[in-house]
Amino acid sequence: MSKGTLFDKVWDLHTVGTLPSGLTQLFIGLHLVHEVTSPQAFAMLRERGLKVLFPERTVATVDHIVPTENQARPFVDRLAEEMIQALEQNCQENNITFYNIGSGNQGIVHVIAPELGLTQPGMTIACGDSHTSSHGAFGAIAFGIGTSQVRDVLASQTLSLSKLKVRKIEVNGALNPGVYAKDVILHIIRTLGVKGGVGYAYEYAGTTFEQMNMEERMTVCNMAIEGGARCGYVNPDQVTYDYLQGRDFAPQGADWEKAVTWWESIKSDADAEYDDVIVFNAADIPPTVTWGITPGQGIGVNQLIPQPEELLEEDRFVAEEAYRYMDLYPGQPIKGTKIDVCFIGSCTNGRLTDLQEAAKIAKGRRVAAGVKAFVVPGSERVKKAAEAEGLDKIFEAAGFEWREPGCSMCLAMNPDKLEGRQISASSSNRNFKGRQGSASGRTLLMSPAMVATAAIQGEVADVRELL
């Protein structure tokens, strides 16, 4: 059993009690809401005559279904328009803060909460979205939940949960040029498997994470769920505090000093006990690309697609399925795979530093003929900041489309979709069958800089050759 970890401390501080089932009733400090998983939850509250218990701890935005080109209302997609109208109504009726399109603060929920300073160390955070683990980058314990649990949090501000074990994942050393936070998490998932973290919270530690900025840490924590972990986190430090200070909802003045003192106290103790510890060397991590239909099917850009006998027996069936679906074969280089669509964005990699790294590759170059490439900022604030630096002009000059904020091609809930057997280079987080809108479309996950490289070369290529 873990002891003295940040997870233990935050869990214990937010425990309301133990239910007859043995589950812990956990208080949720911040509930983030969007248009897809909330309508049914609000409807269930209405049926029971209930109101949102703590509207001041609830914040909403619209992200999944919003078009990234024509955002004029009403939306062309009738269902999307109905969903945003429902969220507008539900927030108004329950006095919930709602950041709508054009507010200056709209964007992907896991991008706007940190940039507003809503996400803070030591919090418990829930959202009806798988990638809520992103907020763990701040030393928060953040869970993705389903619609019925969204209802529970709206009504009671609590969740019924089993306490997780804690695995410490240590990565030490400096990353090589051309290797980014996305490569780190893809490498971890590749090594431990998509089910390796089931029953665990992941604590990311080591000198590599200490050297990362907050947006890089968010990328890693975002994909903890893809490795099976319910949540992932990094202990807060000066990097965290420098990011938060002065943001809209961050403590101010004397309250700031008190907050930092408390945040320091909830960090994992030096002698904390973990259920498991796994250590990686940053120098061993290459620019990584997924070749299959799970985020765990990744290889270095210069490596070959694995032979079945190289895999664990339990992974071979999915590998055989992936070979067929992706139309790739064992022993084939992933480098040189032709690309049709390049997507830079998502809650994994749609922040300012992600766009900056991709722009370094795009600057002075051109998107290859026949490739559709587009960049979708993660929020209105990210878009404004990027345009202030001229990143939009760099991308457009290179032949990329510059879009409005939203989840975009990460998932098939808006107009940005693959067609037929198209294959994409994507900075998003999931490469499941049909994930990007076509039942036969294919997705290769990689860092934003690697996506930009693929766009320029028209195929999977090594970003280090363009640095």
From Swiss-Prot:
Which EC numbers characterise this protein's activity in its record?
4.2.1.33
Task: Extract one GO BP annotation from the record.
Answer: L-leucine biosynthetic process
Which note does the record give on the cofactor?
A: Binds 1 [4Fe-4S] cluster per subunit.
What is one Pfam family matched by this protein?
Aconitase
What are the protein's UniProt keywords? 4Fe-4S, Amino-acid biosynthesis, Branched-chain amino acid biosynthesis, Iron, Iron-sulfur, Leucine biosynthesis, Lyase, Metal-binding
User: Which of this chain's residues are annotated to bind [4Fe-4S] cluster?
Assistant: 347, 407, 410
Q: In which pathway does it act?
A: Amino-acid biosynthesis; L-leucine biosynthesis; L-leucine from 3-methyl-2-oxobutanoate: step 2/4
The record lists the catalysed reaction(s) as:
(2R,3S)-3-isopropylmalate = (2S)-2-isopropylmalate
Task: Cite the GO molecular-function annotations of the record.
Answer: 3-isopropylmalate dehydratase activity; 4 iron, 4 sulfur cluster binding; metal ion binding
Which InterPro entries did the record assign? 3-IsopropMal_deHydase_lsu, Acnase/IPM_dHydase_lsu_aba_1/3, Acoase/IPM_deHydtase_lsu_aba, Aconitase_4Fe-4S_BS, Aconitase_4Fe-4S_dom, IPM_dehydratase_rel_enz, IPMI_cat
> Into which family does the record put it?
Belongs to the aconitase/IPM isomerase family. LeuC type 1 subfamily.
Task: Give the function comment from the record.
Answer: Catalyzes the isomerization between 2-isopropylmalate and 3-isopropylmalate, via the formation of 2-isopropylmaleate.
User: Which NCBIfam families does the entry mention?
Assistant: leuC (TIGR00170), PRK05478.1 (NF004016), PRK12466.1 (NF009116)
| Annotated protein name in UniProt | 3-isopropylmalate dehydratase large subunit
Which lineage do the record's taxonomy fields give for this organism? Bacteria, Bacillati, Cyanobacteriota, Cyanophyceae, Nostocales
Identify the gene encoding this protein.
leuC
